[in-house]
């Protein structure tokens, strides 16, 4: 498929994902408005409203922030056209009527291969695709083949560009650029005590914050 066609297809998926996220928030807003209308005690009603309010806030969409930053094509051994495709992003976005997710939360177990798979250990993945964005607009993609016969690829230019982007203002997340050894730390079991060491600017604080986000998710 020509690159322009691929970009068009991926932009369509991004638009569909944003529409689905809006639908999720609208449904939550309706539930929030109806909370307490069917009776029940005041404490239960207030707890429900607080839960729904937090979910409404969590479902707010910032059009300048990409909903997803990567894609995994899981090898089903039935041909590339029948691969299971999974988009990896900062939050879970459900399909219509709770069907297959349009975007999988980066903290979910199914997203682990995005960070750890390689040609020597593909973890069932045929293709890993990274996306480049500019102010929320999908502008580029980069494919890394991991299936049978694949060889270790050169370093990703999109990944390098994101890692080397100047750090200004508040600390930004690193979910699109987490490295395999960092991912192991982020997803370590709750019972494990970790000591993360490194020189200034090597990402110690970012790893710690993303580990906290992972533990809250799990």
Regions found by a protein language model. Name each.
Residues 196-198:
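Hydrophobic anchor at the beta1->P-loop junction of P-loop NTPases
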């Amino acid at each position: 498929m020509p690159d322009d066609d691929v970009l068009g297809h991926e932009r369509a998926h991004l638009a569909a994902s944003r529409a689905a996220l809006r639908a999720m928030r609208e449904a939550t807003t309706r539930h929030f408005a109806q909370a307490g209308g069917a009776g029940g005690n005041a404490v239960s009603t207030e707890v429900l409203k607080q839960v729904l309010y937090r979910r409404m806030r969590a479902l707010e969409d910032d059009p300048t922030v990409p909903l997803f930053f990567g894609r995994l094509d899981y090898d089903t051994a039935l041909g590339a056209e029948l691969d299971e495709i999974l988009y990896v992003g900062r939050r879970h976005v459900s399909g219509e009527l709770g069907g297959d997710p349009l975007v999988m939360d980066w903290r979910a177990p199914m997203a682990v291969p995005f960070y750890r798979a390689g040609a020597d250990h593909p973890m069932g993945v045929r293709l890993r695709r990274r996306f480049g964005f500019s102010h929320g607009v999908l502008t580029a993609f980069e494919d890394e083949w991991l299936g049978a016969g694949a060889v270790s690829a050169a370093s990703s230019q999109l990944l390098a560009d994101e890692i080397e982007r100047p750090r200004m203002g508040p600390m930004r997340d690193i979910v699109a650029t987490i490295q395999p050894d960092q991912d192991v730390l982020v997803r370590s079991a709750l019972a494990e005590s970790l000591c993360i060491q490194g020189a200034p600017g090597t990402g110690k604080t970012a790893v710690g914050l993303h580990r906290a986000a992972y533990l809250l998710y799990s």
